[in-house]
Amino acid sequence: MSFTENMRNELLENYNESVTENGAVGYRTTGKYLLDINFAVASLRSAKEQEIIESFKKAFFEDKVLAVKWLFFARDVRGGLGERRLFRTAMKFIAEYEPETAAKVIPLVAEYGRFDDMWEFLDNETLCPVVLNYIDSQLKNDIDDKNNQKPISFLAKWLPSVNSSSDRTKVYANIIRKHLGMTERDYRKLLAELRMYLDVVERKMSAKQWGDIKYEAVPSCANLIYNNAFMRNDGERRQEYLSKLEKGETKIHASVLYPHDIVHRYKQYNYGMGRYSLKQYDQALEALWKALPDMVQGNGDTIVVADGSGSMGIRIRNTGVTALDVANALAIYFAERSSGGFKNKYITFSSRPQLVNLDTGKTLRDKISIAIAHNEIANTNVEAVFDLVLSTAIQNKMTQNDIPANVLIISDMEFDRAVCSDCSSCGIDANLFNVIEQKYAQAGYKLPRLVFWNVNSRTGTVPVRQNKLGVALVSGFSVNICNMVMSGELDPYKCLLDTINSERYKPVEDLLIA
């Protein structure tokens, strides 16, 4: 090994310590910058733009092709993480630092995200003509397809309007309009015609054409955001639609929603009681929950451990959503879609672990109520969870096959300091999960494969390093992460590469290396 390689290993081994808010010793980096940023996705929602850029730059300079492919995975609303702000911020860096790389992937931006993800490129001297030519070409295709009664893209829905209340939006609209050689009147007319052909629900709402809305065709997010407006302005038709939905006679779109989006809508703040309470049973929310894509597929080898500690009550960025909302939503989602002994079961942990049984919950509302009742709002003692699993195995003389193959920890990663029963066996620098692994080994068991799902870390502490203990490190809010959770891959970096090197992201690589 060369001197620099040895130095890198020395840094990772002896100069890589980080500490959580509650004193647990972990690491600053996994050893791979791409793995670091992937594990930090949820935390970056609350980060400043420069912090996002600094995190991405390290991965970009480590391996540009992999970093850009990962960025499209991060943005991917259907098969990835669905992170819009992170994608736009990192792409802005690429556009400024290496515009030729950004130019190559512009044709794929709308495929993985939305057309308006590229409007900020209009501020870039190199990329502006590339974006404008792309818009021109796509619009011509859409007009031809419309005239031939074929499906068209959603470009018209996202094109900026010249009469927008936002000055910035109007600037972008006029840049595009002038490139197309249109007057303001012609531009508005074209967008109106294409949006009418697309059957955009917001256009009908603005025109108060409630009776013309086809509820079975309303997109996922619109179903969630406008549910109250539909009931208020078109209650009879909306109720008729929801009744058919319960009977399985129609469908509802929910493919790009996050579980916590739905769970959070069930919450309301009760000022008289000074705390949150649950709203009444909601047919639309229940239907949207059932329509979420099933990424678990009855896998029965995984037990979820959901953090219910006090730090999980911190809100995520500028939303009312808390890390606890996310953890409860993912725990319910995973538990009810599992099979075998772990179906409708998960563990919650703070100062003491509890087994949560969702069997009595008939509706999503019921299950949220059960989950909330088990939120202890104390400190975060993850070690106690593994002690519970181990003692259960020992007391019942279980084999290795009887205990969970995977333990999925959904948390803000601010764990308590490791506590050893025999202090002589672990030094003050003992890492929390090394301590736990030793306990299992002494009892004749292998530690279950660990999956850490970060939903809001604030110290940036990584619980384990690359190739340690056979773990997966994931982050974000999308159920699409479940494929990585249930993967048998023991190396966290390879687990991530399996995802971003899949066929789904091959078009990105093809354009980059062309």
Spans of features found by a protein language model:
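Long lumenal/extracellular ectodomains of secretory and single-pass membrane proteins
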Residues: 1-326, 336-514
